[in-house]
UniProtKB/Swiss-Prot annotation:
GO terms for cellular component: plasma membrane; proton-transporting ATP synthase complex. This is ATP synthase subunit b 2. The chain crosses the membrane at residues 56-76. It is found in: Cell inner membrane. One of its GO terms (molecular function) is proton-transporting ATP synthase activity, rotational mechanism.
Length: 204
């Protein structure tokens, strides 16, 4: 009886251990991890050669999705942006060229107008200079003619005054000479005699 009970207990213990081992094997099978993983080689899973096939598959799928995203979305959008910028740059260059042409034309017109204004200014200055010279010459000629007339009139007046003065001096001299002769010799002389005497003295 005692032996039978001990045998039954050992049998029960062995059965429990076998059941636990079977359960552990099922758990490892369901998780996809080998039982020897607990005591395994310690290799990092991405570097494990048993996983290369699945890694290559996911790499191909990821690359394909990335290629589709690039070719269908990103690259067309970048191309559209580049084309828009290219068109805008071309328009800006055309506008800059047009503005440069307008600026060059405006500068040429300004220089032409400036040259015309300078030529007109020189012409006006030359005309004014010639007109001033002509007016100055005419004024000078008029002044000289006026002075010549005044000088001629003054000379004529001076001649008249001189002639009158000389005539008065002759009469005074004759009267003085008559008075002197009368006082010296007590006689009288005629004006003709005194005039003849003055002429004779003037001739000497």
């Amino acid at each position: 009886m005692f032996v039978t009970a001990a045998y039954a207990q050992s049998t029960t213990t062995e059965g429990a251990e076998a059941h636990d081992a079977a359960a552990a094997g099922e758990v490892h099978t369901e998780t996809g991890v080998a039982h020897e993983g607990e005591h395994g080689s310690g290799v990092f899973p991405p570097f494990d050669s048993t996983h290369f096939a699945s890694q290559l598959l996911w790499l191909a799928i990821t690359f394909g999705l990335f290629y589709l995203l690039m070719s269908k979305v990103i690259i067309p959008r970048i191309g559209s942006i580049l084309e828009t910028r290219h068109d805008r740059i071309a328009q800006d260059l055309d506008e800059a060229s047009r503005l440069k042409g307008e600026a060059d034309a405006a500068i040429a017109a300004y220089e032409q107008e400036l040259a015309g204004a300078r030529a007109k200014g020189h012409s006006i200055a030359d005309t004014a200079r010639e007109a001033a010279k002509s007016k100055a010459k005419a004024d000078r000629d008029g002044v000289e003619a006026d002075l010549a007339k005044k000088i001629a009139a003054a000379e004529a007046r001076i001649g008249d005054i001189k002639s009158k003065a000389l005539a008065d001096v002759g009469a005074i001299a004759e009267e003085t000479a008559t008075a002197i002769v009368k006082q010296l010799i007590g006689g009288t002389v005629t004006k003709s005699e005194i005039a003849a005497a003055f002429k004779a003295s003037a001739g000497n």
